[in-house]
């Protein structure tokens, strides 16, 4: 039988929440606005499936390039290339740097 290679495959621990963080995230996280040039970390929230970037970008840091509706276009370095990913604000955290 062929092995399944879905969007969330091999994410058993990556898309798991700790017991104290279970449930929905605060509403302010969904309403967060970023401006062009902001440094953001891609931190996937498994309780929100909409606007979730591919799990391989979890933990990466990128620059906000533009806003697409309620989502943001983030430029992330993947290997030697820059890739643009579209993510909702629930999956982004502002960098402290």
UniProtKB/Swiss-Prot annotation:
Q: Where is this region: Disordered?
A: 1-24
- Specify whether Ribonucleoprotein is a keyword of the entry: yes
Where along the chain is composition biased (Basic residues)? 9-21
**Domain of life where this protein originates:** Archaea
**Gene3D superfamilies cross-referenced by the UniProt entry:** Ribosomal protein L21
Q: Which family does it belong to?
A: Belongs to the eukaryotic ribosomal protein eL21 family.
Entry's HAMAP family?
A: Ribosomal_eL21
Q: What is this protein called?
A: Large ribosomal subunit protein eL21
